[in-house]
Every structure is written in C-alpha cells, then in structure tokens.
Amino acid sequence: MSGRVGDLSPRQKEALAKFRENVQDVLPALPNPDDYFLLRWLRARSFDLQKSEAMLRKHVEFRKQKDIDNIISWQPPEVIQQYLSGGMCGYDLDGCPVWYDIIGPLDAKGLLFSASKQDLLRTKMRECELLLQECAHQTTKLGRKVETITIIYDCEGLGLKHLWKPAVEAYGEFLCMFEENYPETLKRLFVVKAPKLFPVAYNLIKPFLSEDTRKKIMVLGANWKEVLLKHISPDQVPVEYGGTMTDPDGNPKCKSKINYGGDIPRKYYVRDQVKQQYEHSVQISRGSSHQVEYEILFPGCVLRWQFMSDGADVGFGIFLKTKMGERQRAGEMTEVLPNQRYNSHLVPEDGTLTCSDPGIYVLRFDNTYSFIHAKKVNFTVEVLLPDKASEEKMKQLGAGTPK
C-alpha cells in the first residue's frame, strides 16, 4: 500500500489514528492538518510513530521561530527579488504546480556578497509556502487533492563558479530545511541540459537529500523536451522548454513567471568576503615555499581551494608531478595553474580546477620572492568526486556534451 489517502493498509490506518491522537495538542498551530497532511510525515519516517511525531513537533517549532504563517506577506530584499533565479510556471498533467530552477545565470557569490544568508534561506522558505498555497488553490479548483510539485532543474551553464564552498553550504542548509519541513511534497525533479560537471555538483548536495528524494530525480538526455511533454501539457510549458506557452508580450522564456538571474552589479554588495573556517595553517619562511599534494585517481575530479594570508600577498600555483615519491621543484613539474601572486591578505582567494589527468597534483604556496617577511597562510583544499551513478547515467544518455 502506498500510504496515501484511500490506499492504506489496516496497520497504516491504525498508525494514522494513533498519530493524530499523539499530536492533537499541536494541530491547531498547523494550517490544514487533514489526513493528507499527517500522512506526509508518516510516510517520510516509514510510519514510525515516534520518529514522525518528533519530526512534526520540530516543524511546529520551525513555523513559530521563522513566522511561517506570515512569510508570504514578507518581501525579500530587492537584490534577491531581481537576481535569485527560478519561478513557478504552469501545471503538470495532474494539476501539480511546476517550479523551474535556472542554475547557469545564478550568481551565487554575488548573492552572498549582497544579501544575508538568512534572507536567502527565508526567501526559499517563502517559495515553499507559495507552492503549497498554489497546491491548495489547485485542490479547490480541480475538486481533488493536489499536494505535490514538479521541479525542472535547468543545468545549462553549470560551472565551477557554482561549486564555491559557501554557496554549496548555503544550498545544503536549504535542502536540509526542505527535507525536514516539507516532506513528501516533491513529486519528481527533472534535470535538463546537464553538463559534464553535473555528477560532481550532484555528489556535493547528495548527502543533504533523503533516499526517497534521490529516487525522484530524473536526469534527462538530449530528448528532454519530449520527456517533459509526456508529463506536462505543451500549453503549460514555455516555448524555451519545448512547449507553446509565452508571456502576454510573446516572450518565449515566460520571464514574467521565471526569473533568469544574472550577474549582480557590485553596487548591491554589502561585503567583499564571506567568513571562512580554514582546516590548515602554515608559516612559510622568507625565500621559501610550501607544497601540499593531492592524489587524483581518475579524470573529472575537481580540486577546490580557499586560502588567506596574513599581512601581505602570497604566490600560488598548481603543478602535476612528473616523478613519484620525491619532492620536486616547480620547474621540474608540469604547470597546471600558472603561479601568480594574490592579495589574499586583503580578500580571501578561492578557486576550482577540473583535473583532466590522474596523478599527484601539487598546490604550491610561494614566498620565494620575499627576502624579508615570512607569511602565515590559512587554507582548505578538497578533492570533489563525481557521483558515479549519475555519471554513468549521463554516459548512457549521451547527456554530457553541453559545456
């Protein structure tokens, strides 16, 4: 049995009745605690009454703390309204709202430099509530329960800039919030136009997703427009995505409904860095350098680094070793990222590199040009691995061609 209204086993019916009894003290604090609502929490915890109750009570506290009942009337800051990409547009064949997430033009670093993380998370909460409100409108309009949403995840233009650690961490916080407070609301998620980098990006966010959510993610290949139209009527899909819907002025992207983001002008910036915690600290003597080595076992892995120096600039470059088991000078190795000096004492430096070859990569902090000052450098380096399942899926689909 699916655990949904009208499809409950005797054990599930008994669990529902007991669950309602156990949480009756908090039901008045919830917008519409009908059987559909309660079953979402039970399904999310496999009908474990104790875990379901703990999850729901935590959600009630979340609603109080974040003032969720009034969040739709809250207006996000101007920079978020103008540049946070995505939007609700159309309905699938079952009448469920469709949400578009547009990744490529999203300026994640600009958003975190221009708005507080709390305002960004609050905006995502507001979007969740707007989608649930739309589900309620559809329920009234169609005369049958609508309680889930379809998401189209447009990954065209997904690049290394989107792997910036503070942005991934902020997105992870949102995913945790979604999993904990909006269980069983995702019907399916279509990933379209996924580039070769997608398996690495997906592997970064996968830990924040429940197993059930992961099963609802469908990575589509070159025929993605045809697949979408099997689930959504053409008149409910923008021309940009293979349908016939346009804005009243004929715009094929339906920009009145979907925000396509873009680079954020620096006039919006309220900070030029995001506070970081670094894993390592090293003192580099004058006229010296410091090397850290990372083994890359197969192509497609991504090196991600962040560093800051105290008091003065420092050189940085990446090299590939030509001899194993011994320290090599920069001139003896293959240069991968040219060495240059960075003002990381003023603004922390960060970057990513897709490793096209396996081998030992050396990240070299250079202070050889300084004859007077030693440098203290704080840094974090990570090797980001691709998700093998999605990588294989993309190979099968031939979906790894877009750059």
UniProtKB/Swiss-Prot annotation:
It is found in: Cytoplasm; Nucleus. GO terms for biological process: positive regulation of DNA-templated transcription; regulation of cholesterol biosynthetic process. GO terms for cellular component: cytoplasm; cytosol; extracellular exosome; nucleoplasm; nucleus. Keywords: Activator, Cytoplasm, Lipid-binding, Nucleus, Transcription, Transcription regulation, Transport. Widely expressed. Strong expression in liver, brain and prostate. Residues 76-249 form the CRAL-TRIO domain. This is SEC14-like protein 2.
